[in-house]
């Protein structure tokens, strides 16, 4: 059996990636989120496939088809809520995965890190299109508001928006193409994940100390497969509890009202995992500047490797950088809270301060902290 997995053309790839892969002996539970993301992706593809069998991408029947799935299809309600809450788990794991990369300096693997940022954009686009499909009030108005942001692009903005809509407003053509793109995007994400793993296995995993671990490596199986299985069981327990006891906890009540272009909801807001970006967008009065800030809130991650000034890779032994990192986490939580609040005083000013702080910490304070820590080490 050992010879087959080491010599068979297909099994050999699996063996080198998940069985005999040399891994640092000291990686902690923060390294579990990669496998959890893989499990979430598989779950999303399977549940999405079953939902696609019953869903109809038509403005007159989309809302009814989702109701039909929940009421008439065997375990349709569970499939629907596994898919919806699975997306929340996906983003939770993704944010923690990126946060771990920032804390332990994994961004120094440039190709792996840049693919990670592209994956973040791809999953956000996929989730946005998926949010439109139930064709509730928040689906319709969310699609209208977010796609309309592209009109801020000079010269081609208006034409681009109408091209995406397939008409002069969000309608049947928009829903049909969003449904098609949402379905195909999951496979694009799968391809990007494979590229991400390819680059990761070229360099090997980072570790909490941020040092070269070639002298002390262990095989991935059985040590880390068992560790990952524990993480998967934990995540499934949380997801199951959410689906079975509070399936609508992370959703919006407005989405249980069919889309009505003549009735605007008092407060249009996206899903919780977009709220931080929504807060940054709203904090800037100018439309084009707001859109640029929205894009830069994610794209700024590509600059992090070039802003690294410390002689140490990881923040494990860098107390000043640790403080800044946790201030950044608190700032992102504040932005998430602000993104879900109405646009009024004092939320406007809090959002602006938090948005400025977000960019300032990453662009100015983090590099300065690195230089200061280098100086203190030589002092």
Swiss-Prot record:
Function according to Swiss-Prot or TrEMBL: Component of the ubiquinol-cytochrome c reductase complex (complex III or cytochrome b-c1 complex) that is part of the mitochondrial respiratory chain. The b-c1 complex mediates electron transfer from ubiquinol to cytochrome c. Contributes to the generation of a proton gradient across the mitochondrial membrane that is then used for ATP synthesis.
Miscellaneous comment: Heme 1 (or BL or b562) is low-potential and absorbs at about 562 nm, and heme 2 (or BH or b566) is high-potential and absorbs at about 566 nm.
Binding annotation for a ubiquinone: 201
The protein's name in its UniProt record: Cytochrome b
Entry GO terms, CC: mitochondrial inner membrane; respiratory chain complex III
Annotated heme b b566 binding sites: 97, 196
InterPro entries: Cyt_b/b6_C, Cyt_b/b6_C_sf, Cyt_b/b6_N, Cytb/b6-like_sf, Cytochrome_b, Cytochrome_b_C_euk/bac, Cytochrome_b_N_euk/bac, Di-haem_cyt_TM
Cofactors required: heme b
GO MF annotations in UniProt: metal ion binding; ubiquinol-cytochrome-c reductase activity
Cellular localization per UniProt: Mitochondrion inner membrane
Pfam families documented for this protein: Cytochrom_B_C (PF00032), Cytochrome_B (PF00033)
Cofactor remark: Binds 2 heme b groups non-covalently.
Binding site for heme b b562: 83, 182
Assigned keywords, A-Z: Electron transport, Heme, Iron, Membrane, Metal-binding, Mitochondrion, Mitochondrion inner membrane, Respiratory chain, Transmembrane, Transmembrane helix, Transport, Ubiquinone
Superkingdom as given in the UniProt entry: Eukaryota
Main location: mitochondrion
Listed GO biological process terms: mitochondrial electron transport, ubiquinol to cytochrome c
UniProt subunit comment: The cytochrome bc1 complex contains 11 subunits: 3 respiratory subunits (MT-CYB, CYC1 and UQCRFS1), 2 core proteins (UQCRC1 and UQCRC2) and 6 low-molecular weight proteins (UQCRH/QCR6, UQCRB/QCR7, UQCRQ/QCR8, UQCR10/QCR9, UQCR11/QCR10 and a cleavage product of UQCRFS1). This cytochrome bc1 complex then forms a dimer.
Lineage start: Eukaryota, Metazoa, Chordata, Craniata, Vertebrata
Transmembrane portions of the chain: 33-53, 77-98, 113-133, 178-198, 226-246, 288-308, 320-340, 347-367
Family the UniProt entry places it in: Belongs to the cytochrome b family.
PANTHER family: CYTOCHROME B
Membrane protein topology class: Multi-pass membrane protein
């Amino acid at each position: 059996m050992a010879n087959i997995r080491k010599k068979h053309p297909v099994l050999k790839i699996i063996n080198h990636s998940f069985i005999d892969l040399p891994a640092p002996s000291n990686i902690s539970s923060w390294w579990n989120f990669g496998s959890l993301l893989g499990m979430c992706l598989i779950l999303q593809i399977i549940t999405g496939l079953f939902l696609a069998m019953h869903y109809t991408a038509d403005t007159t029947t989309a809302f009814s088809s989702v109701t039909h799935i929940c009421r008439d299809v065997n375990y349709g309600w569970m499939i629907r809520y596994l898919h919806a809450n699975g997306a929340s788990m996906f983003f939770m794991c993704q944010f923690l995965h990126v946060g771990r990369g920032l804390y332990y300096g994994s961004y120094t693997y440039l190709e792996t890190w840049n693919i990670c940022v592209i994956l973040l954009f791809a999953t956000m686009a996929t989730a946005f299109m998926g949010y439109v499909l139930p064709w509730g009030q928040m689906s319709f108005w969310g699609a209208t508001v977010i796609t309309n942001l592209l009109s801020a692009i000079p010269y081609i903005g208006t034409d681009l928006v109408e091209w995406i809509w397939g008409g002069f407003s969000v309608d049947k053509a928009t829903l049909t193409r969003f449904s098609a793109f949402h379905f195909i995007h999951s496979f694009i994400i799968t391809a990007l994940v494979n590229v991400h793993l390819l680059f990761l296995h070229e360099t090997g995993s980072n570790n909490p100390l941020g040092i070269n671990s070639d002298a002390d490596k262990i095989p991935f199986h059985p040590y880390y497969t068992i560790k990952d299985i524990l993480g998967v069981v934990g995540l499934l327990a949380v997801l199951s509890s959410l689906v079975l006891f509070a399936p609508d906890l992370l959703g919006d009540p407005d989405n249980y009202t069919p889309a009505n272009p003549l009735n605007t909801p008092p407060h249009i807001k996206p899903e919780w995992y977009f709220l931080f970006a929504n807060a940054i967008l709203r904090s800037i009065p100018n439309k084009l500047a707001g859109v640029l800030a929205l894009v830069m809130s994610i794209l700024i991650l590509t600059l992090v490797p070039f802003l690294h000034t410390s002689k140490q890779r990881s923040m494990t032994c860098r107390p000043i950088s640790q403080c800044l990192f946790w201030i950044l986490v608190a700032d992102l939580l504040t932005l998430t809270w602000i993104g879900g609040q109405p646009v009024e005083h004092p939320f406007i000013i809090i959002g602006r301060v938090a948005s400025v702080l977000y960019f300032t910490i990453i662009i100015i304070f983090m590099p300065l902290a690195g230089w200061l820590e280098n100086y203190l080490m030589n002092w």
